[in-house]
């Protein structure tokens, strides 16, 4: 079963048109978090606003003459950025709270790097899990510490898993989350523990390769 995610192939409508020219007042660059692409052509700059009650971060990409805001929604923490080997995509690994993280995806366009999806890629992966039979086996849906993260092996096209997939085609995403389950000791229970799926950068679809089926069945705590 696969799930087509709208807006994951082309850039979301209006993303480029609404681009600001520079960080707003109050945002200052935190140079220790600056990241460069492997070829040095793209620089990701992270700007912090300390004037708000909760510190806010913005992420900007410099490439040639383009200086683009990667996401209009500010973040609460700095982030890590990973480039695909062909440099056409960037994955942002974003902490969103204690023990909680998600993923965002950006695509290279003539206007620079822009959002590939309206929702975070991590949220889309959770949406996909909810369409699967494994979700219906859960004793309880995750209540906190819900995280989406990349499976190791991204930079070598996951050949360590014994697969021979096309280069720069897939992202493997793992999901984890906890819930308080009455009768369990302790109540805090990892109800999703590294459930994995694959995202196709070319088609914008999720699927579960057969080699993950067995482990995925064990990654959810059943009733």
Task: Please annotate each region the language model reported.
Residues 5-7, 12-36, 102, 106, ...:
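Acidic, small-residue rich beta-repeat scaffolds with periodic aromatic anchors
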Residues 26, 70-75:
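Surface loop/turn motifs at the tips and blade-to-blade linkers of beta-strand repeat domains
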Residues 73-79, 120-125:
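Short coil/turn segments at the loop-to-beta-strand junctions that recur within blades
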């Amino acid at each position: 079963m696969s799930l087509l995610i709208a807006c994951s192939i082309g850039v979301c409508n209006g993303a480029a048109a609404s681009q600001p020219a520079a960080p707003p007042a109050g945002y200052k660059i935190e140079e220790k978090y600056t990241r460069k692409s492997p070829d040095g052509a793209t620089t990701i700059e992270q700007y912090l606003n300390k004037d708000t009650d909760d510190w806010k971060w913005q992420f900007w990409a410099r490439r040639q003459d383009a200086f683009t805001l990667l996401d209009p929604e500010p973040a609460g923490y700095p982030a890590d950025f990973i480039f695909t080997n062909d440099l056409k995509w960037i994955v942002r690994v974003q902490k969103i709270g204690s023990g909680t993280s998600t993923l965002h995806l950006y695509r290279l366009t003539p206007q620079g790097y822009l959002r590939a999806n309206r929702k975070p890629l991590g949220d889309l992966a959770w949406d996909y899990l909810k369409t699967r039979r494994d979700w219906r086996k859960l004793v309880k849906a995750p209540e906190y510490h819900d995280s989406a993260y990349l499976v190791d092996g991204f930079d070598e096209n996951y050949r360590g898993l014994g697969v021979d997939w096309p280069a720069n085609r897939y992202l493997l995403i793992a999901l984890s989350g906890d819930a308080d389950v009455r009768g369990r000791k302790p109540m805090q229970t990892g109800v999703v523990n590294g459930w994995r799926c694959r995202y196709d950068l070319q088609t914008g679809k999720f699927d579960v390769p057969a080699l993950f089926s067995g482990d995925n069945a064990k990654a959810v705590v059943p009733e």
